[in-house]
Regions:
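Glycine-rich phosphate/ribose-binding loops and adjacent secondary-structure elements
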Residues: 333-335, 432-443, 447, 455-461, ...
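Short beta->alpha connector loops at strand-helix junctions that form conserved
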Residues: 41, 451-453, 472-475, 563, ...
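Nucleotide/phosphate-binding sheet-loop regions of phosphoryl- and nucleotidyl-transfer enzymes
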Residues: 1-392, 425-428, 435-440, 446, ...
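Structural motif
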Residues: 241, 411, 428-430, 449, ...
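Conserved alpha/beta-domain cores
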Residues: 93, 520, 530-878
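Protease-associated
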Residues: 361-445, 507-513, 524, 528-532, ...
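C-terminal domain-closing interface element
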Residues: 337-339, 494-542, 548
């Protein structure tokens, strides 16, 4: 049987999301439950894959099935595509299986041409209708030119602005039919000017080009960035939805809106949305005109509003989740154009999940599974200091579109935001309105401020998804983009001016207001308590200071999975002694210098044990090459020479001798302990003495040090270092006359260690996968240099993700799995964890659960993310 590439809305349902995309599956589902949906069809995600396989062309079979879909639509709707008497006009919209707001392209009013426009006007002499037809036509030419033919929107915007200026009006709605007719002609001329061909008038050709454009938009730069950030595979493809147009811009009895069944910023159980009279859907979402609140719709269209409230209830009860809906009213009649589970802020996600359990819609397991772990990061984001905020006077106010507090220097373009942020500047991106092209700048900014657009504009939706503070629709701003400045309440802001914005209240302030850490609400505790019931993986933290350890404990960490000891050497009072050790000529001189460092290390470790209150602490012995600890500036070298009674030339010779061609694979990790066993001895004494002290002071704590040897690649190497550690530790314990248990394990960060894990496990009490180095060593590229070529790899579709941010499960993951399978049978008591940056990435945590790790360890602020991801992995496995 030939492939079925096209499904009408009557043939699908919500279980067919992978084939029909989210939008198509939900349109079919709404049709099935009897809601007012204009009847159209969906071209499948498989057709998108086929389009790319066929060299970015739509084959005849797909097109012929699409035309059968059009014939079905004609029959159901009683209109004909391209007909002069009763024309069927359609919208063509994308819809991937995962929601990607504003990332892909939409075309409205398709099927119009000069003849159809003339025939429509002839059939209805009402001047308002004539205005509507020309309005629809000029919109179609502009959208088609921009989305399908890639002629920039700006050329058309300039023509509109010029026309409004000539006519002395502020809004598009104030332009007359004659003005819009002139614009349509100007737009077609601009199209020809840009492309050298006439605007296509054949509706079938328009449709084919539009379908191709939606498929093509799956691979546009902003969609690729969004996919990479949201773990959406390139192979999924997008579906295309073709449906009859309903016109919110028909007259003043019509309108369009976007609404959420609950507040997407706070989670409060109340309808939140916006509505525009005499407008098309894109006007609300694109944020071109600032709309009115949804409640006002009751005054304008009482019957349609009453029906809409019923639809909201039906959808929430059907999907058991907060819904984001797009709808249009045409001549007072309601039509539903889309529904999906709404994007929401992290606080809203937690509140909605807890409320849905309380209302009987969800079980605790389902509530835990419905929250995106990455969003939890945003909960822990700063707010303004309350006292400083009270003393500050807002200059103006927009809509609080995405919560949090942001302050920084004003920049006006996405490129400037990226450039300034790369220099270490904190910036706030100020735009008339954002468009999907601004995504990289939005990611680099501390906050986003827009002049136009509501709570459902592009800026608002994307900022909420990224957890970036956003204030939208501040119409009091007088913007001069050309000269990179704006005025608000008489104050002029230029590039680099300091500004603060509050994404919760929408307030805008001059200058920088200090921020404080976020306060976590009750729902967070509830969700985390449920998550902890379901997860099997333990979650530890990577922390080198008591303050970090304490923060991580507050956020639920169950121990330290990685304490990097080298950070402790860099402090002013210790670095001198460590440099003395490096420059020493004999073992005795080295030991003498290390004895000066010992009390510092011991007090550091003691403070960490105290912060962890008996939870496990894994201490990694010295890892970086010694070259990193010596001075490279001549002034400091002179000081060191004077301190040590050496000549400058002698110090320079030592520094020079430590230089390496490839330090990442050089004299570092356990290789330092093999060359200088006295370093490992000193560190062992510090660890054990600190543990003995804390054990004596807190008899009820189970203090059991875990000593971790870095960068092992060979059993004999581990044996050598372990012998130094065990002899030193046992002597300390015997001298103190106490009973203290400790463990010696190793990092697995060299492929050879993973492949010989059955040998290494005979000497190791635990394995900890250092996936930062393991990724570097497996791929053979350096984390510090990969940025230079990774973008080219994304563009060429060689990689979809940064392997340093998201664990490479097929290569690095296979090495981890191999190490566990080889190690555990030899040493059944062996426990295994991960302490690279991947420990806080949800998809990597899920993989760690699958291969049977005992714990993951991540930075303190990612501990809640890992706890939730670990619970979701356990729930998904059931």
């Amino acid at each position: 049987m030939a492939n079925k590439w096209v499904y009408t809305f009557k043939e699908g349902n919500m279980s067919m999301r992978n084939l029909l995309g989210g939008k198509g599956a939900n349109l079919a589902e709404m049709t099935e439950i009897g809601l007012p949906v204009p009847q159209g069809f969906t071209i499948t995600t498989e057709a998108c894959t086929q389009y790319y396989e066929d060299g970015r062309k739509i084959n005849d079979e797909i097109m012929s099935q699409a035309m059968e879909g059009v014939a079905w639509m004609e029959e159901v709707n009683g209109k004909k595509f391209g007909d002069l008497e009763n024309p069927l006009l359609v919208s063509v919209r994308s819809g991937a299986r995962a929601s990607m707001p504003g990332m892909m392209d939409t075309i409205l009013n398709l099927g119009l041409n000069d003849e159809v426009v003339a025939a429509m006007i002839k059939g209805n002499p009402d001047p308002a209708f004539e205005r509507f037809v020309y309005d629809s036509y000029r919109r179609f030419i502009q959208m088609f030119s921009d989305v399908v033919m890639e002629v920039g929107k700006k050329y058309f915007e300039q023509l509109i602005d010029k026309m409004k200026e000539e006519k002395g009006v502020k809004f598009d709605v104030d332009l007359t039919a004659e003005d819009l007719k002139t614009l349509a002609e100007q737009f077609k001329a601009e199209y020809k000017n840009q492309l050298g061909t006439d605007f296509p008038s054949d509706p079938v050709e328009q449709l084919k080009l539009a379908i191709e454009a939606v498929f093509r938009s799956w691979d546009n730069p902003r969609a690729n960035v969004y996919r990479r950030d949201n773990d959406i595979p390139y192979s999924w493809g997008t579906a295309v939805n073709v449906m009859p147009m309903v016109f919110g811009n028909l007259n003043n009895e019509s309108g369009t809106g976007v609404a959420f069944t609950r507040d997407p910023a706070t989670g409060e159980n109340k309808l939140m949305g916006e509505f525009l009279i005499n407008a098309q859907g894109e006007d609300v979402v694109a944020g071109v005109r600032t709309p009115m609140p949804i409640a006002q719709m009751e005054k304008e269209f009482p019957e349609a509003y009453a029906e809409f409230l019923k639809v909201c209830d039906t959808l929430e009860n059907h999907y058991h989740d907060m819904q984001d809906m797009e709808f249009t009213v045409e001549n007072k009649k309601l039509y539903m154009l889309q529904c999906r589970n709404g994007k929401r802020t992290a606080p809203a996600a937690l509140k909605i999940a807890c409320d849905l359990v309380a209302e009987g819609h969800k079980t605790p397991e389902e509530a835990v599974a419905m929250i995106d772990p990455r969003n939890l990061d945003t909960l822990l984001h700063p707010q303004f200091d309350a006292a400083a905020l009270k003393a500050a006077t807002p200059l103006g106010k927009g809509l609080g579109a995405s919560p949090g507090a942001a302050c920084g220097k004003v920049v006006f373009t996405a490129d400037d935001a990226v450039e300034w942020a790369a220099r270490g500047e904190k910036v706030v991106l100020v735009r008339l309105e954002t468009s999907p092209e601004d995504i990289t700048g939005m990611k680099s900014a501390q906050g986003i401020l827009t002049v136009r657009g509501g709570m459902t504009s592009h800026a608002a939706v994307v900022a909420r998804g990224m957890g970036t503070c956003c204030v939208s629709g501040c119409g009091d701003i007088n913007m001069d983009e050309e000269n990179k400045k704006f005025t608000l309440a008489g104050v002029e802001f230029t590039e680099g001016s300091e500004i603060s914005i509050d994404g919760t209240t929408g307030n805008i302030y001059q200058g920088l207001i200090p921020t404080v850490d976020a306060q976590i609400a009750g729902e967070f505790g509830q969700i985390m308590a449920w998550a902890d019931q379901f997860r099997k993986l333990k979650v530890r933290t990577n922390a080198d200071t008591p303050a970090d350890a304490k923060k991580a404990r507050e956020l639920g960490a169950e121990g330290i999975g990685l304490c990097r000891t080298e950070h402790m050497f860099f402090e002013e009072d210790r670095i001198a002694a460590f440099r003395e050790m490096i420059c020493a000529d004999t073992v005795e001189a080295r030991e003498k210098a290390l004895d000066k460092i010992l009390p510092y290390q011991q007090s550091d470790f003691k403070a960490l044990y105290e912060a962890l209150e008996g939870c496990p602490v894994t201490i990694r012995f010295l890892d970086p090459p010694l070259h990193e600890f010596v001075p490279h500036e001549e002034a400091e070298q002179i000081k060191l020479a004077n301190d040590l009674g050496k000549t400058l030339d002698e110090v320079k010779a030592i520094v020079e001798s430590l230089k390496e061609f490839n330090p990442m694979m050089g004299h570092r990790g356990c290789r330092l302990a093999v060359t200088y066993p006295e370093i490992a001895k000193m560190q062992t004494k510090a660890v054990i003495r600190a543990a003995i002290e804390v054990q004596k002071e807190h008899a009820d704590w189970n203090v059991k040090p875990e000593i971790m040897i870095p960068l092992t690649c060979e059993l004999k190497e581990l044996k050598f270092v372990k012998k130094v550690v065990v002899e030193t530790a046992d002597a300390e314990i015997a001298a103190a006359g106490v009973d203290l248990k400790y463990e010696v394990g190793t990092m697995i960060e060299i492929p050879r260690a993973a492949l010989t894990a059955d040998e290494i496990a005979t000497e190791a009490d635990f394995f900890c996968f250092g996936t930062n180095d393991l990724t570097q060593m497996t791929f053979g590229f350096s984390r510090d240099d990969a940025g230079k070529f990774l973008d080219a790899y994304y563009d060429a579709k060689i990689f979809e993700n940064d392997p340093f941010a998201k664990l490479d499960q097929t290569g690095v993951g296979k090495l981890m799995e191999t190490a566990i399978k080889l190690g555990k049978p030899v040493n059944p008591a062996l426990h295994c964890g991960i302490c690279g940056e991947h420990g806080g990435d949800p998809s990597s945590v899920e993989f760690c659960h699958k291969i049977g790790l005992d714990y993951v360890s991540c930075s303190p602020f990612r501990v809640p993310v890992a706890r939730l991801a670990a619970a979701q992995a356990a729930i998904a496995e059931k």
